[in-house]
From Swiss-Prot:
Species assigned in the record: Methanococcus maripaludis (strain C6 / ATCC BAA-1332)
Pfam families xref list: DeoC
Residue numbers binding 1-deoxy-D-threo-hexo-2,5-diulose 6-phosphate: D33, H34, G35, V36, S37, Y153, P154, R155, G209, G210, G237, R238
GO terms for biological process, alphabetical: amino acid biosynthetic process; aromatic amino acid family biosynthetic process
Name of the protein this chain belongs to: 2-amino-3,7-dideoxy-D-threo-hept-6-ulosonate synthase
Phylogenetic placement of the source organism: Archaea, Methanobacteriati, Methanobacteriota, Methanomada group, Methanococci
Length: 272
């Protein structure tokens, strides 16, 4: 894939091909790491059911903590990529923005992972610790040929707007500079400003799905706009696993990301 021409590590390239579509060179990732931060939310109480639904819908990968492998591994049908999340923090912690490392790259390899991910809250009071973790783990990923996804979110006392194009661009660039192969960050809400974020980041950017939207059309239009602005995929959790038709919304997202269909056409995939 052309966007990974700068990566010479064969192991990384092989694994990246498992979580990116070779034709569109984009990805649809369904994060299910919310159980650690927010508890057993609707939609992920039984992770195996959700994993099977998004796999049937055409998602490229699921993302979660090591427990996802034990309790949500796909038992039949088409395979789906596995991304192990290495960071943890909870909404009931004294500092919900602080993320700590709870597993290793080596453990992710033993679990059969195709990539690992880290969460960094740029602007948090403990952000320097998360920067250190990202930089050091990127070296370990290089040694083992493991792709690294950095979730770079502007969050903290000085962050007034988490979608501010300047802070989103800074967060994305920071992740790439510290060694991430793929950046997951906020969509700015506007294609023109997001284009500038993409231009300023040497690593491909996958947009976060964000909080649950009011309508499917609103959500899918955001995905469409982000792809046209240079995004290389979407990583959406709640807008997928809390949907009444998990398989259908996944198919709709894939139609837009991989086939560039119009939103009205993609909406036809949703049956409920």
């Amino acid at each position: 894939m052309k966007m990974f021409d700068n990566i010479k590590n064969v192991g990384k390239l092989i694994r990246l091909e498992r979580i990116f579509d070779k034709n569109s060179e984009k990805t649809v990732i369904i994060p299910m790491d919310h159980g650690v931060s927010s508890g057993p939310l609707d939609g992920i109480k039984d992770m195996r059911i959700t994993t099977n639904a998004v796999a049937d819908g055409g998602a490229n990968a699921v993302l979660g903590h090591k427990g996802l492998v034990r309790h949500g591994h796909r038992g039949y049908g088409r395979d789906i990529g596995l991304i192990i999340h290495m960071s943890a923090g909870t909404s009931i912690s004294p500092d919900p923005n602080k993320k700590v490392i709870v597993t290793t790259v080596e453990d992710a390899i033993r679990l059969g992972a195709d990539a690992v991910s880290l969460h960094v809250n740029v602007g948090a009071e403990t952000d320097f610790e998360m920067y250190r973790d990202l930089g050091l783990i990127s070296e370990t990923c290089e040694q083992w040929g493991m792709p690294l996804i950095a979730m770079m979110y502007p969050r903290g006392p000085k962050i007034k707007d988490e979608k501010d194009p300047e802070v989103v661009a800074h967060a994305a660039r920071l992740g790439a500079e510290l060694g991430a192969d793929i950046i997951k960050t906020n969509y700015t809400g506007d294609p023109d400003t997001f284009k500038e974020v993409v231009k300023g980041c040497p690593a491909p950017i996958v947009i976060a799905g964000g909080p649950k939207t009011n309508t499917d059309e609103e959500f899918l239009q955001m995905v469409k706009d982000a792809m046209h602005a240079g995004g290389k995929g979407v990583a959406s959790g709640r807008n997928v696993f809390q949907h009444k038709d998990v398989k259908g919304i996944t198919r709709a997202i894939c139609k837009i990301v991989h086939e560039d269909v119009e939103v009205k056409e993609a909406l036809k995939e949703i049956k409920i």
